[in-house]
């Protein structure tokens, strides 16, 4: 047995004292949500391809890793300062327990949600005895933990991948490559997110079309477009340069999906304008109306190194300083990396059939044949869980001929 994994069936996520009490008023700024938008906006500047990221999870991981630090370690002060400035979490402020409690509540929602398969595994490389704080991560943070025997990158990645495959119930295959791990690493985290939405309404497969997705006036590619007509939350706001529609998930879900497209200019202008306040404003002003949706059928698979991303924003203490106490009777170590993989599937599957209308031409149109943003969010406080965009066509190998122009809803004509 090369990788010792601690797996608990249930997760009492955070331990609180009896003195922990919620705020009497909601927070003026939702820092959890703002970090999600900030990270997405900064990341997309250098990311010209299709994108999906779970910023929610990256922040949660580092909030949880606070328990592996000790105040007497000088490096802890640098980490705390960067948590406050970059990840917008102040471990010395008045609200750390409230923040952790909120993560606990959201994690419980995710555990009940069958549209998500999410797994986080923290592995320490070495034979030395591990600290109790490290072994407690499953209880305190719902992070699986493992002890990985040193070996070649090929050996270690194979053992690590076997553990990820096991705890994700075969959802995540071949998570690490040999280039993700080396003999010098002491501490590594893998973060896997798979979203395959079970919608409230089934897309009508008989009305699937083959149409062009237009990146710009010179770049396009054929994709299969799904079709749905139903009463949905929809909004068109020229003052905010956005057209939006909500695709609700199945009955009882705590999560939903929002699609947004620019009504003028390009998608970069829309992305730069987004923050949590704007997202809430858009959502609050949307209204239910008969809406036709055409959405590309696609699967995105995106892999990130959190180290390379976060260091660009000034968050480097976790990776450069010996700050995490994972070995007993040994000095602290830096975190090698957090490797995040996101798989997002947009497909037909729905809980119920859409209503049949006599006149199918009436109603709003949301035709996603140009770059658009998608947000998978928690419905109570509108916190983004996964956010990203589709900007280039992903043409299936077995794509058929293009449908006629009317079936493709008269796609955009760029000037």
Curated annotation (Swiss-Prot):
Q: Give the principal location in a single coarse category.
A: secreted
What Gene3D superfamilies does the entry give?
A: Alpha-1-antitrypsin, domain 1, Antithrombin, subunit I, domain 2
Q: Which residues are glycosylated?
A: 117, 166, 216, 320
The protein's pH behavior is summarized as: Optimum pH is 8.0.
Q: Name one GO molecular function term.
A: toxin activity
SUPFAM superfamilies assigned: Serpins
Pfam families to which the protein is assigned, alphabetical: Serpin
Alphabetized UniProt keyword annotations: Blood coagulation cascade inhibiting toxin, Glycoprotein, Hemostasis impairing toxin, Protease inhibitor, Secreted, Serine protease inhibitor, Signal, Toxin
How does this chain assemble? Answer: (Microbial infection) Interacts with Zika virus envelope protein E and Zika virus-like particles; the interaction does not affect Zika virus replication in human endothelial cells and keratinocytes.
Anything else the record notes? Patients with dengue virus or Zika virus infections during the acute or early convalescence phase have higher levels of IgG serum antibodies against the protein.
Tell me the protein's name. Answer: FXa-directed anticoagulant
Q: Which gene encodes it?
A: SRPN25
